[in-house]
Design a protein with these regions (language model features):
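Short glycine/proline- and charge-enriched loop/turn segments
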Residues: 142-151
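Short, flexible active-site recognition loops that position polar ligands and cofactors
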Residues: 150-160
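A cross-taxonomic marker for long C-terminal extensions/tails that follow the last structured domain
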Residues: 158-178
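Conserved AdoMet/S-adenosylmethionine-binding subsite of the radical SAM
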Residues: 1-136, 140-142
């Protein structure tokens, strides 16, 4: 197939541009997708979502307090938007970056998978993807002159990623690992 995926920063911060780009793609029969954290109110993002062929979003942590600790915001809006997305019938996928000591607990992955199984009533979630930790983000912290809290952290062993995949699959959803 192929197409265009708009990613960030955060795409929803540039929504008018993203909508114009999606319209231009569709005018040329090019499919369009976004990668997003879905942290904006649904009524603001729904016009863009309606135009897309696919939405890829992150859900890092199931617990809102833990989400706030690690990202600076709670996850209520994100989870509400995933529910809206599932109800909309739009094809989507959800990803969790596996950050050692932050998002990689059995409980977190099981809770996210259970939530996704609960909301995927129209079976339009293509799959849930577990993304192993990528230490390449270090340059971002350096460019912002901030200390990287994950400096020196290594990706999870393949066996551990497969174990988390198995835990998530117990919710009855399709789970991929990268």
């Amino acid at each position: 197939h192929g197409g265009l995926t708009i990613s960030g920063g955060e795409v929803l911060c540039q929504q008018p541009f993203a909508e114009a780009l999606v319209d231009a793609c569709h005018a040329e029969d090019i499919e369009a997708a976004i990668e997003t954290n879905l942290s904006f109110p649904w009524e603001k993002i729904e016009p863009l979502i309606r135009k897309l062929d696919l939405v890829m979003c992150d859900l890092k942590l199931a617990d809102t307090d833990a989400h706030k600790k690690w990202t600076g915001i709670g996850n209520e809006q994100i989870k509400e938007n995933i529910r809206h997305l599932a109800e909309s019938g739009k094809p989507f996928l959800v990803r969790t970056p596996l950050i050692p000591g932050a998002t990689d607990s059995d409980e977190n992955i099981a809770a996210i998978a259970a939530y996704l199984a609960e909301v995927n009533t129209k079976n339009t979630m293509l799959y849930y993807e577990l993304l192993n930790f990528n230490p390449l983000g270090d340059s971002k912290y350096k460019s912002m002159r901030r200390k990287n809290p994950f400096e020196g952290v290594k990706p999870l062993p393949t066996a551990r990623v497969k174990e988390l995949q198995s835990i998530a699959q117990q919710a009855g959803i399709t789970v991929r690992v990268e």
